Curated annotation (Swiss-Prot):
<feature type="transmembrane region" description="Helical">
    <location>
        <begin position="65"/>
        <end position="85"/>
    </location>
</feature>
<keyword id="KW-0472">Membrane</keyword>
<dbReference type="Pfam" id="PF03699">
    <property type="entry name" value="UPF0182"/>
</dbReference>
<dbReference type="GO" id="GO:0005886">
    <property type="term" value="C:plasma membrane"/>
</dbReference>
<feature type="transmembrane region" description="Helical">
    <location>
        <begin position="134"/>
        <end position="154"/>
    </location>
</feature>
<protein>
    <recommendedName>
        <fullName>UPF0182 protein bll7333</fullName>
    </recommendedName>
</protein>
<feature type="transmembrane region" description="Helical">
    <location>
        <begin position="185"/>
        <end position="205"/>
    </location>
</feature>
<feature type="transmembrane region" description="Helical">
    <location>
        <begin position="17"/>
        <end position="37"/>
    </location>
</feature>
<dbReference type="InterPro" id="IPR005372">
    <property type="entry name" value="UPF0182"/>
</dbReference>
<feature type="transmembrane region" description="Helical">
    <location>
        <begin position="220"/>
        <end position="240"/>
    </location>
</feature>
<feature type="transmembrane region" description="Helical">
    <location>
        <begin position="297"/>
        <end position="317"/>
    </location>
</feature>
<keyword id="KW-1003">Cell membrane</keyword>
<comment type="similarity">
    <text>Belongs to the UPF0182 family.</text>
</comment>
<keyword id="KW-1133">Transmembrane helix</keyword>
<feature type="transmembrane region" description="Helical">
    <location>
        <begin position="264"/>
        <end position="284"/>
    </location>
</feature>
<keyword id="KW-0812">Transmembrane</keyword>
Length: 927
């Protein structure tokens, strides 16, 4: 007995030291966590204040705080209540019984020792601490859903009802997600309460669990029954919410509520609500009865009912009743799915028009569509990116991240151009130059941009550059007065500006040019307290120790376009491709942003996307020099955007106040267009019978690529639509029938005002064969002349590169096909545009330039305008020297017209020359 008592006493100092270390570690962890939270808060507050969105910051912080406190309080109260009840009831048991029951499973340790330890614990404080800690974890997770609850509170009506329950669609977009979160939290809180109480009962011996005995006291049964009843009550509500989730089901035929769901699934859910209510009442009744059988029966009632009513019966009903007459029974539900999917993605706004595919092109037609011809894109992304890198990166630390297609009015004409910003990547500096000063103080910004027309090339096959060099030189392109790029796609680290040393600006010969920042970007960091804050935030003591930082210095953070926009508006989904715009001598980034939801009723989810509703409601403009961010609301009819505008009334500006020059550069975003095009492959079919049988399913065209077969990507193009008076900027993509290669339609999105955002699909006659891109590629590969030339180049040590897309060019009611061909040395990295391949009708040609290709294409028999029959009735005369001279003169004039791009003049002179030559030929035969 003496040994058992004195042993622990001798170990007490060591145990106290261990406890002290544990407490110290916990205190340090808590302090470090609070410091990290405080630094994040202060940095965010400073940053939001500087860029002018302090109201957004406080609204977001306030919403997170309210959700956190509400969830923490509710969870803690529930856990505390159950913990204290368990403690109150458990103390009625004898301490000796408690000790014996617990320690019997641990090897029959002395029961008096456990009783001593248990009795010395301050259980109320321990329960309070445990409840608060568990609630903290739950609340921290739920605080991230602040946007869902704000949308619930500020929701805007959609203005249309779902056809099954007649609820406004806004209920599904804004209320249902909040209800599901609340339901899930209630289930979690009840489950944690049960575990929390069970732990207390176990320690106090109310629950016995060993190899000889498994039992629990009547008190535990009563408490557990009360919680089980609450769980069944929440489950009843969950089944009620499941009625609405039927609108998101997918049985393979239709997305949304099907015939089986409405006639079997919905009644089954009502029955499950009733059974769950009965189970809840039975569980609560067991608080007095205190038996195992009643809760077990309640649980089996719900479990078996759910399996039979929600699982087995619908499967049997679908298999033996619905499947034999599936189309007839599912017809109204297929029609709902078609209508609501088209509505969710704005597919119902696509205007369908016929395209005759007459193939009646002539020189006169080409001349009438000169803007289209002059903007056929011959420079593909990758070859042009390689060329830019070789010719214009100038130093290893400059990088062209991505090339973009845009349009500008240059020299009085509407031109499609490729443009890319010359950004700075300090990580590409030599290894011995990878210093903190270089990364954060000296090499702070990129410089200028490169721009080239999509069609023109030099005599060496290189792009003609409208913008080039450092500092930027404009040769036909827009002037850049402020070329420095502090914010872009490559910038992922902070920099210090307005320091004690000038920043590297650009290289000039053997020397460098330096400059000092003179803008408003960045957060002030001159004060010691702010230097300490950012040093802790970035875990970088150099910010505190560096002598380069002065009282006027500013630190630029979040310089990446995507990160910058997401930090301000995390509820917006961003397009993958922000693009550079030069306006009034300054450089801006234009970022498309989407409002999305995955709760639009009965709508097909987008492929590989967690959404079934999307709108391009917001355009974001970021100043490349100052980093200012402006959000412009494009779609005032979007209820999701309207809801966020209610939440953040000063975040969005009307699109009408966007500078007019920037408005001219908005374009239809490719990500949205792809989603819509993918869905339109099926959802252009509006008749339920046709949709069910997939009779008219479309797909994207195939084309050779990457050593195999790839899917054609959409492309931007300037062209004039049939019946329109002027050329416009479009995003377009051809379509082909499923498992076929002939073209069936082409989809286009208009990018210019006043018709921005309107989608048009031009459908070809089903009885007429129109070659698709893959078929034209096959014809190109079958051309002996082209194949021989490509083989010859490959044998001469050059690598032939085909264009990524064979461009389908609609002109009037005809289709022209164009693809470039590049040459690159076997071990070189400088592609040259060497040939242009053009196809029209049955003819395929390859020439050095587009003009020559079109000239050759339309001089083939059958492709030119037919010669007037009056030619044969002209009086016969002998060919003379004057006729030969006139024919030669006509030829020379035709060549001049061709070089100047005057297709109409070329056609006139060529036809006149042909008439002369035919006349001379006839008279020679007569002789």
């Amino acid at each position: 007995m003496t040994i058992g008592i004195t042993g622990p006493e001798r170990k007490a100092p060591r145990q106290s030291a261990v406890v002290g270390l544990i407490i110290a570690a916990l205190v340090i962890a808590i302090v470090l966590t609070l410091l990290a939270l405080a630094s994040d808060f202060l940095v965010d507050w400073l940053w939001f204040s500087v860029i002018g969105y302090r109201e957004v910051f406080w609204t977001t912080i306030g919403a997170k705080a309210v959700v956190f406190l509400a969830v923490w309080t509710a969870t803690a109260v529930i856990l505390l209540l159950n913990g204290w009840l368990a403690l109150h009831f458990a103390r009625r048991r004898s301490t000796q019984l408690a000790a014996a029951s617990v320690w019997s499973a641990a090897g029959n340790a002395p029961p008096d020792l456990l009783a001593l330890v248990r009795d010395r614990l301050r259980w109320p404080r321990l329960i309070a601490a445990g409840a608060a800690s568990l609630a903290l974890l739950v609340a921290a997770a739920e605080a991230g859903n602040w946007g869902v609850f704000l949308q619930f509170v500020y929701q805007a009506p959609y203005g249309a009802d779902d056809p099954l329950y007649n609820n406004d669609i806004g209920f599904y977009l804004f209320s249902l997600p909040a209800y599901i979160l609340i339901k899930n939290w209630m289930m979690l809180a009840l489950a944690l309460s049960a575990l929390f109480a069970a732990a207390i009962y176990l320690v106090h011996g109310e629950i016995e669990y060993d190899i000889h005995r498994r039992s629990m006291s009547s008190t535990v049964i009563a408490h557990g029954s009360a919680l089980l009843g609450l769980l069944f009550a929440v489950k009843a509500w969950s089944f009620g919410l499941d009625r609405y989730l039927l609108l998101y089901g997918d049985n393979g035929v239709v997305v949304g509520a099907s015939y089986t769901d409405v006639h079997v699934g919905l009644p089954a859910l009502w029955l499950m609500i009733g059974l769950s209510g009965i189970a809840a009442l039975a569980a609560w009744a067991n608080v007095r009865v205190r038996t195992y059988r009643l809760p077990a029966a309640a649980f089996l009632l719900v479990a078996i009912g759910s399996f039979v009513l929600s699982g087995l019966v619908p499967v049997l009903f679908r298999q033996f009743f619905v499947r034999p007459s599936e189309l007839e029974l599912e017809r109204p539900y297929i029609e709902r799915n078609i209508a609501l999917t088209r509505q969710a993605y704005n597919l119902d706004q696509i205007a369908a028009k016929p395209f005759a595919a007459e193939q009646k092109l002539s020189f006169k037609t080409l001349d009438a569509n000169k803007a289209t011809i002059d903007n056929i894109r011959l420079w593909d992304w990758q070859p042009l990116a390689d060329t830019y890198a070789q010719l214009q990166e100038i130093r290893t630390y400059y990088k062209f991240h991505h090339l973009d297609v845009d349009r500008y009015w240059l020299n009085g004409s509407y031109q499609s151009v490729m443009i890319s910003a010359r950004e700075l990547r300090p990580s590409l500096l030599p290894p011995n130059a990878q210093t903190w000063v270089n990364h954060h103080v000296l090499f702070t910004h990129g410089t200028g941009a490169v721009m080239s027309p999509v069609t023109r090339k030099s005599s060496e096959g290189l792009p003609f550059l409208y913008l080039r060099d450092i500092p930027p030189v404009a040769d036909g392109g827009p002037q850049i007065r402020e070329p420095r790029i502090y914010y872009g796609e490559e910038h992922d680290s902070y920099v210090i500006v307005k320091g004690s040393t000038p920043e590297f600006d650009y290289p000039k010969g053997k020397d460098n040019v330096y400059a000092a920042y003179d803008g408003t970007g960045g957060v002030p960091i001159g004060a010691a307290v702010w230097r300490g804050l950012f040093a802790y935030y970035f875990n970088d003591p150099n910010l505190l120790l560096s002598s380069y930082i002065t009282a006027d210095s500013r630190i630029m953070i979040r310089r990446n376009i995507g990160e910058r926009v997401r930090t301000i508006a995390p509820f917006l989904r961003l397009d993958h491709d922000p693009y550079l715009v030069i306006s009034n001598g300054r450089m801006f980034w234009m970022q498309d942003a989407y409002t999305v939801s995955s709760y639009f009723p009965s709508a097909q989810p987008a492929q590989d996307q967690d959404l079934n509703y999307i709108r391009n409601s917001v355009k974001v403009i970021v100043d490349a020099y100052n980093g200012t961010v402006d959000f412009y609301l494009m779609d005032t009819g979007d209820p999701v955007a309207a809801t966020w505008r209610r939440i953040f009334p000063n975040l969005f500006k009307p699109f009408s106040v966007m500078p007019a020059d920037l408005q001219r550069h908005i374009r239809y975003p490719e990500d949205l267009f792809l989603i819509q095009a993918q869905l339109y492959q099926s959802y252009h079919m509006e008749a339920a019978d046709v949709f069910y049988n997939r009779e008219d399913l479309w797909q994207f065209p195939r084309q050779p690529g990457g050593g195999g077969v790839a899917t054609m990507a959409p492309y931007y193009i300037i062209m004039r639509l049939p019946g329109e008076s002027q050329a416009e900027f479009f995003l377009m993509l051809p379509m082909v029938p499923s498992r076929r290669d002939n073209m069936i339609a082409w989809l286009a999105a208009r990018c210019d005002a006043p018709d921005y955002g309107k989608l048009i699909v031009y459908e070809f006659p089903k009885e007429k064969l129109v070659y698709g891109p893959f078929q034209i590629e096959a014809r190109i590969n079958q051309s002996t002349e082209i194949s021989q030339q490509i083989t010859l180049w490959n044998q001469m040590g050059s690598r032939v590169i085909r264009g990524a897309n064979l461009l389908v060019i609609p002109i009037e009611n005809s289709i022209l096909y164009v693809t470039p061909l590049y040459l690159r040395a076997e071990h070189g990295h400088l592609p040259e545009l060497k040939r242009v391949i053009a196809a029209y009708g049955e003819h395929v040609v390859m020439k050095e330039t587009l003009d020559e290709a079109l000239s050759a294409l339309f001089t083939e028999p059958g492709a030119v305008r037919p010669v007037s029959s009056t030619m044969e009735e002209m009086p016969v005369t002998r060919p003379s020297a004057s006729q030969a001279r006139e024919a030669l003169d006509r030829y020379n004039q035709a060549v001049e017209r061709l070089r100047s791009g005057d297709w109409k003049g070329f056609g006139t002179q060529f036809d006149a020359m042909r008439e002369l030559l035919e006349d001379m030929n006839r008279h020679s035969a007569d002789r």
